[in-house]
Protein backbone atom coordinates (compact mmCIF):
# COMPACT_ATOMS: atom_id res chain seq x y z
CA UNK A 1 0.00 0.00 0.00
CA UNK A 2 1.40 3.40 -0.98
CA UNK A 3 0.95 6.27 1.48
CA UNK A 4 1.19 9.82 0.19
CA UNK A 5 -0.44 13.24 0.06
CA UNK A 6 -2.48 14.49 -2.86
CA UNK A 7 -2.92 12.27 -5.89
CA UNK A 8 -2.12 15.24 -8.11
CA UNK A 9 0.76 17.70 -7.92
CA UNK A 10 -1.71 20.55 -8.43
CA UNK A 11 -5.23 19.73 -7.32
CA UNK A 12 -7.94 21.61 -9.19
CA UNK A 13 -10.00 22.10 -6.03
CA UNK A 14 -7.13 23.44 -3.92
CA UNK A 15 -5.28 26.75 -4.27
CA UNK A 16 -1.54 26.91 -4.84
CA UNK A 17 -0.68 27.60 -1.19
CA UNK A 18 -2.52 24.55 0.14
CA UNK A 19 -1.46 22.36 -2.77
CA UNK A 20 2.19 23.18 -2.05
CA UNK A 21 1.80 22.32 1.63
CA UNK A 22 -0.03 19.09 0.82
CA UNK A 23 2.90 17.90 -1.31
CA UNK A 24 5.66 18.89 1.14
CA UNK A 25 7.44 16.56 3.54
CA UNK A 26 7.67 19.49 5.93
CA UNK A 27 6.34 23.04 5.99
CA UNK A 28 7.18 25.91 8.30
CA UNK A 29 5.43 28.90 9.82
CA UNK A 30 7.60 31.93 10.47
CA UNK A 31 7.22 35.34 12.05
CA UNK A 32 8.08 38.40 10.01
CA UNK A 33 7.75 42.12 10.59
CA UNK A 34 5.18 43.18 13.21
CA UNK A 35 5.06 39.52 14.27
CA UNK A 36 2.88 38.57 11.32
CA UNK A 37 2.83 34.83 10.72
CA UNK A 38 3.43 33.41 7.25
CA UNK A 39 3.90 29.91 5.85
CA UNK A 40 6.54 28.45 3.57
CA UNK A 41 6.54 25.00 1.96
CA UNK A 42 9.04 23.04 -0.08
CA UNK A 43 6.65 23.31 -3.01
CA UNK A 44 6.95 27.10 -3.11
CA UNK A 45 8.87 28.59 -6.00
CA UNK A 46 12.58 28.99 -5.26
CA UNK A 47 12.67 26.68 -2.24
CA UNK A 48 14.85 23.60 -2.41
CA UNK A 49 15.73 20.34 -0.68
CA UNK A 50 18.61 17.89 -1.08
CA UNK A 51 19.07 14.43 0.37
CA UNK A 52 22.18 12.67 1.66
CA UNK A 53 21.33 8.96 1.70
CA UNK A 54 23.02 6.29 3.80
CA UNK A 55 21.41 2.86 3.68
CA UNK A 56 17.93 3.20 5.23
CA UNK A 57 18.22 6.82 6.38
CA UNK A 58 18.73 10.25 4.91
CA UNK A 59 19.69 13.71 6.09
CA UNK A 60 17.49 16.22 4.29
CA UNK A 61 18.56 19.85 3.96
CA UNK A 62 15.64 22.20 3.34
CA UNK A 63 16.11 25.79 2.23
CA UNK A 64 13.14 28.16 2.39
CA UNK A 65 14.73 30.92 0.34
CA UNK A 66 12.09 33.65 0.47
CA UNK A 67 11.63 33.17 4.21
CA UNK A 68 15.40 33.23 4.74
CA UNK A 69 15.25 30.08 6.86
CA UNK A 70 16.98 26.74 6.38
CA UNK A 71 17.01 23.57 8.46
CA UNK A 72 17.83 19.88 8.26
CA UNK A 73 15.81 16.86 9.25
CA UNK A 74 16.50 13.14 9.37
CA UNK A 75 14.36 10.36 7.91
CA UNK A 76 14.83 6.70 8.83
CA UNK A 77 12.83 3.72 7.58
CA UNK A 78 12.79 0.53 9.69
CA UNK A 79 10.55 -2.48 9.17
CA UNK A 80 7.03 -1.18 9.88
CA UNK A 81 7.78 2.45 10.70
CA UNK A 82 9.21 5.72 9.41
CA UNK A 83 10.83 8.27 11.75
CA UNK A 84 11.27 11.94 10.88
CA UNK A 85 13.26 14.19 13.21
CA UNK A 86 13.83 17.94 12.92
CA UNK A 87 17.42 18.80 13.86
CA UNK A 88 17.00 22.03 15.79
CA UNK A 89 20.70 22.88 15.92
CA UNK A 90 20.74 23.14 12.12
CA UNK A 91 18.16 25.94 11.95
CA UNK A 92 19.52 29.10 10.34
CA UNK A 93 17.62 32.38 10.16
CA UNK A 94 19.31 34.51 7.53
CA UNK A 95 16.85 37.42 7.45
CA UNK A 96 14.82 39.15 10.14
CA UNK A 97 12.27 36.36 9.96
CA UNK A 98 12.14 33.85 12.81
CA UNK A 99 11.05 30.22 12.77
CA UNK A 100 7.74 29.73 14.56
CA UNK A 101 6.54 26.19 13.81
CA UNK A 102 7.34 23.07 11.80
CA UNK A 103 4.75 20.72 10.28
CA UNK A 104 5.81 17.11 9.53
CA UNK A 105 4.07 15.28 6.66
CA UNK A 106 0.93 17.38 7.17
CA UNK A 107 -1.18 15.72 4.47
CA UNK A 108 0.00 12.12 4.80
CA UNK A 109 -3.01 9.92 4.06
CA UNK A 110 -5.27 12.86 3.22
CA UNK A 111 -8.73 11.97 1.88
CA UNK A 112 -10.99 14.17 -0.21
CA UNK A 113 -14.39 14.30 1.48
CA UNK A 114 -15.71 10.69 1.70
CA UNK A 115 -13.95 9.25 -1.36
CA UNK A 116 -12.23 6.65 0.85
CA UNK A 117 -13.95 4.96 3.81
CA UNK A 118 -12.21 5.51 7.11
CA UNK A 119 -11.39 8.16 9.66
CA UNK A 120 -8.78 10.22 11.47
CA UNK A 121 -7.97 9.48 15.11
CA UNK A 122 -7.11 12.34 17.51
CA UNK A 123 -6.13 12.11 21.23
CA UNK A 124 -9.08 14.20 22.42
CA UNK A 125 -9.94 13.06 25.94
CA UNK A 126 -10.79 9.36 25.70
CA UNK A 127 -9.88 9.52 22.01
CA UNK A 128 -12.05 10.65 19.10
CA UNK A 129 -12.64 9.56 15.52
CA UNK A 130 -13.37 11.99 12.71
CA UNK A 131 -14.98 9.91 9.97
CA UNK A 132 -14.63 11.03 6.36
CA UNK A 133 -17.80 12.77 5.20
CA UNK A 134 -18.95 15.22 2.59
CA UNK A 135 -17.62 18.69 3.33
CA UNK A 136 -19.45 20.49 6.10
CA UNK A 137 -19.51 23.95 7.60
CA UNK A 138 -17.35 24.18 10.71
CA UNK A 139 -16.10 27.08 12.80
CA UNK A 140 -12.87 25.48 14.02
CA UNK A 141 -10.41 22.67 13.48
CA UNK A 142 -9.10 20.29 16.12
CA UNK A 143 -5.94 21.99 17.38
CA UNK A 144 -4.85 20.86 20.83
CA UNK A 145 -1.52 21.19 22.55
CA UNK A 146 -0.18 17.82 23.70
CA UNK A 147 -0.21 17.51 27.52
CA UNK A 148 -2.58 20.46 27.86
CA UNK A 149 -2.24 24.19 27.58
CA UNK A 150 0.77 26.03 28.96
CA UNK A 151 -0.26 28.54 31.63
CA UNK A 152 2.91 30.52 30.92
CA UNK A 153 1.81 31.16 27.33
CA UNK A 154 -1.87 30.32 26.84
CA UNK A 155 -4.62 32.30 28.54
CA UNK A 156 -6.50 29.84 30.77
CA UNK A 157 -10.17 30.42 31.50
CA UNK A 158 -13.32 28.39 31.98
CA UNK A 159 -15.84 27.85 29.21
CA UNK A 160 -18.85 30.07 29.85
CA UNK A 161 -21.29 32.66 28.56
CA UNK A 162 -20.08 36.25 28.43
CA UNK A 163 -23.47 37.54 29.59
CA UNK A 164 -23.81 35.19 32.56
CA UNK A 165 -22.78 35.83 36.16
CA UNK A 166 -22.09 32.15 36.67
CA UNK A 167 -20.87 29.35 34.45
CA UNK A 168 -23.19 27.63 32.01
CA UNK A 169 -23.72 24.06 33.22
CA UNK A 170 -24.12 22.88 29.62
CA UNK A 171 -20.73 24.21 28.55
CA UNK A 172 -17.60 22.21 29.26
CA UNK A 173 -13.91 22.83 28.76
CA UNK A 174 -12.26 20.92 25.95
CA UNK A 175 -10.62 17.64 26.92
CA UNK A 176 -6.85 17.42 27.16
CA UNK A 177 -4.55 15.44 24.90
CA UNK A 178 -2.67 13.36 27.48
CA UNK A 179 -1.18 10.94 24.93
CA UNK A 180 1.09 12.11 22.05
CA UNK A 181 -0.52 10.10 19.23
CA UNK A 182 -2.81 10.49 16.24
CA UNK A 183 -3.67 8.31 13.26
CA UNK A 184 -5.35 7.71 9.92
CA UNK A 185 -7.39 4.74 8.66
CA UNK A 186 -8.09 3.93 5.01
CA UNK A 187 -10.77 1.26 5.17
CA UNK A 188 -11.30 -0.63 8.42
CA UNK A 189 -9.01 -3.69 8.58
CA UNK A 190 -7.27 -2.58 5.40
CA UNK A 191 -4.59 0.09 5.89
CA UNK A 192 -3.75 2.60 8.61
CA UNK A 193 -0.93 4.43 10.30
CA UNK A 194 -0.43 5.62 13.86
CA UNK A 195 1.88 8.58 14.46
CA UNK A 196 3.70 8.82 17.80
CA UNK A 197 5.32 12.10 18.84
CA UNK A 198 8.47 10.79 20.50
CA UNK A 199 10.44 13.94 21.19
CA UNK A 200 9.31 17.53 21.69
CA UNK A 201 5.78 16.44 22.61
CA UNK A 202 5.49 19.16 25.27
CA UNK A 203 5.85 21.79 22.50
CA UNK A 204 3.70 20.00 19.94
CA UNK A 205 0.07 20.14 18.92
CA UNK A 206 -2.14 17.69 17.06
CA UNK A 207 -3.99 19.47 14.26
CA UNK A 208 -6.87 17.83 12.38
CA UNK A 209 -8.94 19.55 9.70
CA UNK A 210 -12.17 17.93 8.44
CA UNK A 211 -13.36 18.36 4.88
CA UNK A 212 -15.05 21.73 4.46
CA UNK A 213 -12.75 23.57 6.83
CA UNK A 214 -10.64 25.65 4.39
CA UNK A 215 -10.21 22.74 1.91
CA UNK A 216 -12.28 19.77 0.73
CA UNK A 217 -9.73 17.39 2.25
CA UNK A 218 -9.52 15.60 5.60
CA UNK A 219 -6.00 15.83 6.99
CA UNK A 220 -4.18 15.51 10.31
CA UNK A 221 -0.67 16.47 11.37
CA UNK A 222 1.66 17.21 14.23
CA UNK A 223 2.94 20.77 14.59
CA UNK A 224 6.03 21.66 16.61
CA UNK A 225 6.11 25.19 18.01
CA UNK A 226 9.53 26.75 18.49
CA UNK A 227 8.49 30.33 19.22
CA UNK A 228 5.45 32.13 20.57
CA UNK A 229 4.11 35.51 19.55
CA UNK A 230 2.70 37.36 22.55
CA UNK A 231 1.55 40.75 23.84
CA UNK A 232 4.21 42.59 25.81
CA UNK A 233 3.31 45.50 28.15
CA UNK A 234 5.15 48.73 27.37
CA UNK A 235 3.72 51.07 30.02
CA UNK A 236 1.78 51.05 33.29
CA UNK A 237 -1.49 51.99 31.60
CA UNK A 238 -1.67 48.56 30.02
CA UNK A 239 -0.62 49.35 26.45
CA UNK A 240 0.96 46.35 24.75
CA UNK A 241 2.81 45.52 21.56
CA UNK A 242 3.09 42.21 19.75
CA UNK A 243 6.51 40.64 19.96
CA UNK A 244 8.08 37.19 19.80
CA UNK A 245 10.54 35.07 21.71
CA UNK A 246 14.11 36.01 20.86
CA UNK A 247 15.43 32.47 21.12
CA UNK A 248 13.72 29.36 19.82
CA UNK A 249 12.98 26.52 22.22
CA UNK A 250 15.84 24.02 22.06
CA UNK A 251 14.57 20.56 21.14
CA UNK A 252 14.31 18.13 18.23
CA UNK A 253 10.78 17.42 17.09
CA UNK A 254 10.50 13.72 16.28
CA UNK A 255 7.54 11.70 14.96
CA UNK A 256 7.42 8.00 14.11
CA UNK A 257 4.74 6.68 11.76
CA UNK A 258 3.78 3.04 12.38
CA UNK A 259 2.07 1.43 9.39
CA UNK A 260 -0.68 -1.09 10.15
CA UNK A 261 -2.57 -3.44 7.87
CA UNK A 262 -5.36 -6.02 7.81
CA UNK A 263 -6.95 -6.73 11.23
CA UNK A 264 -4.55 -4.26 12.92
CA UNK A 265 -5.67 -1.36 10.72
CA UNK A 266 -8.23 0.33 12.97
CA UNK A 267 -8.31 2.30 16.22
CA UNK A 268 -8.20 -0.92 18.26
CA UNK A 269 -5.07 -1.96 16.40
CA UNK A 270 -3.55 1.45 17.16
CA UNK A 271 -4.32 0.98 20.86
CA UNK A 272 -2.70 -2.46 20.91
CA UNK A 273 0.38 -1.15 19.10
CA UNK A 274 0.72 1.83 21.41
CA UNK A 275 0.35 -0.38 24.49
CA UNK A 276 3.17 -2.54 23.15
CA UNK A 277 5.37 0.53 22.61
CA UNK A 278 4.87 2.05 26.08
CA UNK A 279 5.33 -1.34 27.77
CA UNK A 280 8.61 -1.87 25.93
CA UNK A 281 9.71 1.67 26.86
CA UNK A 282 8.97 1.07 30.56
CA UNK A 283 6.28 3.76 30.62
CA UNK A 284 3.52 1.27 31.37
CA UNK A 285 4.25 -1.51 33.85
CA UNK A 286 2.03 -4.19 35.32
CA UNK A 287 0.76 -3.20 38.76
CA UNK A 288 2.09 -5.61 41.38
CA UNK A 289 -1.10 -5.20 43.42
CA UNK A 290 -3.87 -7.60 42.43
CA UNK A 291 -7.33 -6.77 43.74
CA UNK A 292 -9.69 -9.65 44.41
CA UNK A 293 -12.52 -7.14 44.88
CA UNK A 294 -13.35 -4.10 42.78
CA UNK A 295 -11.86 -1.13 44.70
CA UNK A 296 -14.01 1.78 45.85
CA UNK A 297 -12.51 5.27 45.71
CA UNK A 298 -13.82 7.78 48.28
CA UNK A 299 -12.84 11.43 48.18
CA UNK A 300 -13.61 12.94 51.60
CA UNK A 301 -13.63 16.67 52.32
CA UNK A 302 -12.39 17.36 55.84
CA UNK A 303 -13.01 21.09 56.11
CA UNK A 304 -13.47 24.17 53.97
CA UNK A 305 -13.04 27.92 54.32
CA UNK A 306 -16.27 29.89 54.81
CA UNK A 307 -16.62 33.46 53.56
CA UNK A 308 -17.26 35.98 56.31
CA UNK A 309 -18.17 39.65 56.44
CA UNK A 310 -14.87 40.75 57.99
CA UNK A 311 -12.94 37.54 58.64
CA UNK A 312 -13.31 34.21 56.91
CA UNK A 313 -14.53 31.28 58.98
CA UNK A 314 -14.04 27.54 58.90
CA UNK A 315 -16.59 24.80 58.29
CA UNK A 316 -15.67 21.33 59.50
CA UNK A 317 -17.15 18.68 57.22
CA UNK A 318 -15.59 15.30 58.07
CA UNK A 319 -13.42 14.76 61.13
CA UNK A 320 -10.91 11.92 61.23
CA UNK A 321 -13.17 10.00 63.65
CA UNK A 322 -16.14 10.46 61.29
CA UNK A 323 -14.00 9.20 58.42
CA UNK A 324 -13.19 6.13 60.54
CA UNK A 325 -16.91 5.56 61.15
CA UNK A 326 -17.64 5.75 57.41
CA UNK A 327 -14.91 3.23 56.62
CA UNK A 328 -16.01 0.94 59.45
CA UNK A 329 -19.63 1.05 58.29
CA UNK A 330 -18.59 0.09 54.76
CA UNK A 331 -16.37 -2.70 56.13
CA UNK A 332 -19.27 -4.14 58.15
CA UNK A 333 -21.24 -4.21 54.90
CA UNK A 334 -18.46 -6.29 53.32
CA UNK A 335 -16.88 -3.42 51.36
CA UNK A 336 -13.22 -3.59 52.34
CA UNK A 337 -11.13 -2.65 49.32
CA UNK A 338 -11.44 1.11 49.81
CA UNK A 339 -9.14 3.92 48.76
CA UNK A 340 -9.78 7.11 50.74
CA UNK A 341 -8.43 10.50 49.70
CA UNK A 342 -8.67 13.07 52.51
CA UNK A 343 -8.77 16.70 51.31
CA UNK A 344 -8.83 19.85 53.43
CA UNK A 345 -7.10 18.29 56.44
CA UNK A 346 -4.70 21.22 56.83
CA UNK A 347 -5.44 24.11 59.19
CA UNK A 348 -8.37 26.20 57.85
CA UNK A 349 -9.35 23.60 55.25
CA UNK A 350 -9.89 23.69 51.50
CA UNK A 351 -9.00 27.10 50.00
CA UNK A 352 -8.26 28.39 53.51
CA UNK A 353 -4.98 26.73 54.45
CA UNK A 354 -1.72 28.46 53.70
CA UNK A 355 0.12 27.22 50.63
CA UNK A 356 2.59 24.49 51.56
CA UNK A 357 1.36 23.97 55.13
CA UNK A 358 1.41 20.40 56.46
CA UNK A 359 -0.21 20.86 59.87
CA UNK A 360 -3.40 18.94 60.66
CA UNK A 361 -6.33 21.13 61.73
CA UNK A 362 -6.95 20.36 65.42
CA UNK A 363 -10.73 20.56 64.91
CA UNK A 364 -10.50 17.36 62.88
CA UNK A 365 -8.53 15.32 65.41
CA UNK A 366 -4.89 14.62 66.16
CA UNK A 367 -2.07 12.76 64.44
CA UNK A 368 -2.87 9.63 66.45
CA UNK A 369 -6.39 9.61 64.98
CA UNK A 370 -4.91 10.05 61.50
CA UNK A 371 -2.54 7.11 62.02
CA UNK A 372 -5.44 4.97 63.24
CA UNK A 373 -7.46 5.74 60.09
CA UNK A 374 -4.40 4.99 57.97
CA UNK A 375 -3.90 1.63 59.73
CA UNK A 376 -7.60 0.72 59.62
CA UNK A 377 -7.67 1.02 55.84
CA UNK A 378 -4.35 -0.76 55.35
CA UNK A 379 -5.29 -3.70 57.57
CA UNK A 380 -8.40 -4.32 55.48
CA UNK A 381 -6.67 -4.17 52.10
CA UNK A 382 -7.44 -0.52 51.39
CA UNK A 383 -5.35 2.62 51.04
CA UNK A 384 -5.36 6.02 52.69
CA UNK A 385 -4.16 9.11 50.82
CA UNK A 386 -3.46 12.59 52.12
CA UNK A 387 -4.60 15.05 49.47
CA UNK A 388 -2.16 17.80 48.56
CA UNK A 389 -2.25 20.48 45.88
CA UNK A 390 1.27 21.88 45.40
CA UNK A 391 0.44 23.55 42.07
CA UNK A 392 -2.26 26.19 42.61
CA UNK A 393 -3.32 28.63 45.31
CA UNK A 394 -5.68 31.56 45.80
CA UNK A 395 -4.98 35.14 46.85
CA UNK A 396 -5.38 34.36 50.57
CA UNK A 397 -3.19 31.26 50.61
CA UNK A 398 0.10 32.87 49.58
CA UNK A 399 1.68 36.13 48.41
CA UNK A 400 0.95 36.24 44.70
CA UNK A 401 3.98 38.39 43.90
CA UNK A 402 6.49 35.97 45.40
CA UNK A 403 4.77 32.62 44.83
CA UNK A 404 3.15 32.84 41.40
CA UNK A 405 5.01 31.88 38.25
CA UNK A 406 5.06 34.51 35.51
CA UNK A 407 3.86 34.19 31.94
CA UNK A 408 5.91 35.15 28.93
CA UNK A 409 4.00 38.47 28.99
CA UNK A 410 5.10 39.01 32.62
CA UNK A 411 1.62 38.44 34.03
CA UNK A 412 0.85 36.03 36.85
CA UNK A 413 0.17 32.48 35.63
CA UNK A 414 -3.45 31.88 36.52
CA UNK A 415 -6.79 30.28 35.68
CA UNK A 416 -10.02 32.28 35.91
CA UNK A 417 -13.49 30.77 36.19
CA UNK A 418 -16.43 32.59 34.66
CA UNK A 419 -18.57 32.19 37.79
CA UNK A 420 -18.24 35.58 39.53
CA UNK A 421 -20.20 34.28 42.52
CA UNK A 422 -17.31 32.06 43.56
CA UNK A 423 -15.30 33.10 46.60
CA UNK A 424 -12.07 32.67 44.64
CA UNK A 425 -12.74 32.75 40.87
CA UNK A 426 -9.01 32.97 40.09
CA UNK A 427 -6.32 30.50 41.07
CA UNK A 428 -2.61 31.10 40.56
CA UNK A 429 0.13 28.66 39.63
CA UNK A 430 3.20 28.39 41.82
CA UNK A 431 6.82 28.51 40.69
CA UNK A 432 7.85 24.97 39.67
CA UNK A 433 10.56 25.16 42.34
CA UNK A 434 7.89 25.87 44.98
CA UNK A 435 5.91 22.86 43.74
CA UNK A 436 8.98 20.70 44.26
CA UNK A 437 9.61 22.14 47.75
CA UNK A 438 5.96 21.70 48.76
CA UNK A 439 5.97 18.03 47.78
CA UNK A 440 9.31 17.47 49.50
CA UNK A 441 7.88 18.92 52.73
CA UNK A 442 4.87 16.58 52.51
CA UNK A 443 7.11 13.54 52.06
CA UNK A 444 9.36 14.63 54.94
CA UNK A 445 6.51 15.34 57.37
CA UNK A 446 4.37 12.31 56.43
CA UNK A 447 6.85 9.65 55.23
CA UNK A 448 4.49 6.73 55.96
CA UNK A 449 1.50 8.15 54.10
CA UNK A 450 0.36 7.73 50.52
CA UNK A 451 -0.34 10.96 48.63
CA UNK A 452 -3.13 12.15 46.35
CA UNK A 453 -1.13 14.70 44.34
CA UNK A 454 -3.46 17.18 42.64
CA UNK A 455 -2.74 18.79 39.24
CA UNK A 456 0.89 17.70 38.94
CA UNK A 457 -0.23 14.77 36.79
CA UNK A 458 -1.70 16.77 33.93
CA UNK A 459 -0.22 20.26 34.13
CA UNK A 460 3.13 21.48 32.89
CA UNK A 461 3.92 25.13 32.46
CA UNK A 462 6.99 27.29 32.10
CA UNK A 463 8.00 30.16 34.35
CA UNK A 464 9.36 33.44 33.01
CA UNK A 465 10.20 34.97 36.38
CA UNK A 466 13.30 37.17 36.35
CA UNK A 467 15.34 34.97 38.66
CA UNK A 468 13.82 31.64 37.67
CA UNK A 469 13.27 31.16 33.94
CA UNK A 470 12.13 27.59 33.44
CA UNK A 471 11.01 26.20 30.09
CA UNK A 472 7.99 23.91 29.72
CA UNK A 473 10.42 21.11 28.87
CA UNK A 474 12.47 21.70 32.03
CA UNK A 475 9.32 21.99 34.14
CA UNK A 476 8.14 18.60 32.87
CA UNK A 477 11.50 17.09 33.76
CA UNK A 478 11.75 18.41 37.32
CA UNK A 479 8.11 17.66 38.17
CA UNK A 480 8.42 14.12 36.79
CA UNK A 481 11.59 13.53 38.80
CA UNK A 482 9.92 14.88 41.95
CA UNK A 483 6.90 12.58 41.59
CA UNK A 484 9.13 9.57 40.92
CA UNK A 485 10.98 10.23 44.21
CA UNK A 486 7.77 9.72 46.19
CA UNK A 487 8.19 6.07 47.16
CA UNK A 488 4.74 5.59 48.67
CA UNK A 489 1.61 5.09 46.56
CA UNK A 490 0.28 8.05 44.58
CA UNK A 491 -3.11 9.02 43.18
CA UNK A 492 -2.88 11.07 39.98
CA UNK A 493 -5.84 12.58 38.16
CA UNK A 494 -5.93 11.88 34.40
CA UNK A 495 -2.11 11.90 34.26
CA UNK A 496 -0.12 12.66 31.14
CA UNK A 497 1.55 9.67 29.53
CA UNK A 498 5.03 10.36 30.93
CA UNK A 499 3.72 9.84 34.51
CA UNK A 500 1.91 6.55 33.97
CA UNK A 501 4.82 4.61 35.42
CA UNK A 502 4.58 6.61 38.68
CA UNK A 503 0.80 6.30 39.05
CA UNK A 504 -0.52 3.89 41.69
CA UNK A 505 -4.17 4.82 41.20
CA UNK A 506 -5.47 6.60 38.09
CA UNK A 507 -8.65 8.62 38.72
CA UNK A 508 -11.01 10.69 36.56
CA UNK A 509 -10.04 9.03 33.31
CA UNK A 510 -11.92 10.87 30.53
CA UNK A 511 -14.92 8.91 29.26
CA UNK A 512 -15.68 11.13 26.28
CA UNK A 513 -14.16 13.61 23.86
CA UNK A 514 -14.78 17.34 23.55
CA UNK A 515 -17.78 16.69 21.28
CA UNK A 516 -16.76 18.89 18.38
CA UNK A 517 -19.38 18.74 15.62
CA UNK A 518 -17.06 16.80 13.31
CA UNK A 519 -16.11 14.16 15.92
CA UNK A 520 -18.24 11.14 15.11
CA UNK A 521 -17.09 8.57 17.69
CA UNK A 522 -15.69 8.68 21.23
Language-model segments: what does each one mean?
Residues 266-267, 273, 277-278, 319-322, ...:
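An active-site-proximal structural segment forming one wall of the substrate-binding cleft
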Residues 337-522:
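Aromatic- and carboxylate-enriched substrate-binding clefts and catalytic-loop regions
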Residues 1-317, 324-338:
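Carbohydrate-recognition beta-sandwich/jelly-roll modules
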Residues 74, 262, 311-318, 322, ...:
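Conserved aromatic-histidine-acidic binding/catalytic patches
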Amino acid sequence: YVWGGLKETKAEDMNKKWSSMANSIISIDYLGGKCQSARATLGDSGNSINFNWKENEAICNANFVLAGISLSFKMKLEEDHLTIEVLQNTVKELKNNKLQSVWILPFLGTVKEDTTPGYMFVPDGSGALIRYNKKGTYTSVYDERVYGKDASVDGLSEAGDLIAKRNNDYMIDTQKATIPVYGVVHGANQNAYMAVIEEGAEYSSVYASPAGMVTDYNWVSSRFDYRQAYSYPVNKSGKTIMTTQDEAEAYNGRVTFYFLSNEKADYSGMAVKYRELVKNAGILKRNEREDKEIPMYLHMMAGVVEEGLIFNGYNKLTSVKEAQDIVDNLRRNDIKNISVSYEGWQKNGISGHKYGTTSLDSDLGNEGDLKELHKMLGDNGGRFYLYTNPVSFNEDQARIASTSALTISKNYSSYTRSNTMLMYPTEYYAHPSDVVDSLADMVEDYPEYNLDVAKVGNMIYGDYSKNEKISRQKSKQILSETVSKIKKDKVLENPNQYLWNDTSEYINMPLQNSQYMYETDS
